[in-house]
């Protein structure tokens, strides 16, 4: 049997916010990752749900968070198959990872984004 992948979720970027060189390379790396994933899965139009990384305000190590966030916004703006999902209002356990209630909220937002793409 085979299956069809409805969408991909990408929720990463905080680690890249901790070093300027990584943050500056993030946009290009993200574009390459999305292109390679689509090529591997055989679908140029694979929808990707991109969760906006944290702003780093609660974590001084994430000094370059805004560079990563801007890269994410640019990738989503340039690719009609990428939907940016905001998580700024969710609660973090350790300055990076969401607590259980916020994981559920994010899951609902992601499901809603997939369903909205169908319509």
Task: Provide a role label for each language-model segment.
Residues 1-119:
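Cell-envelope and extracellular/periplasmic
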């Amino acid at each position: 049997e085979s299956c069809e992948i409805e969408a991909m979720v990408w929720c990463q970027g905080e680690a890249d916010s901790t070093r300027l060189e990584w943050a500056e390379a993030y946009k290009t790396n993200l574009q390459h990752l999305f292109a390679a994933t689509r090529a591997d899965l055989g679908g140029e139009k694979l929808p990707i749900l991109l969760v906006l990384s944290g702003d780093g305000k609660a974590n001084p190590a994430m000094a370059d968070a805004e560079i990563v966030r801007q890269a994410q916004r640019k990738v989503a703006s340039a690719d009609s198959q990428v939907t940016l999902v905001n998580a700024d209002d969710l609660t973090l356990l350790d300055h990076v990872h969401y607590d259980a209630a916020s994981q559920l909220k994010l899951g609902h937002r992601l499901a809603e984004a997939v369903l909205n793409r169908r319509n």
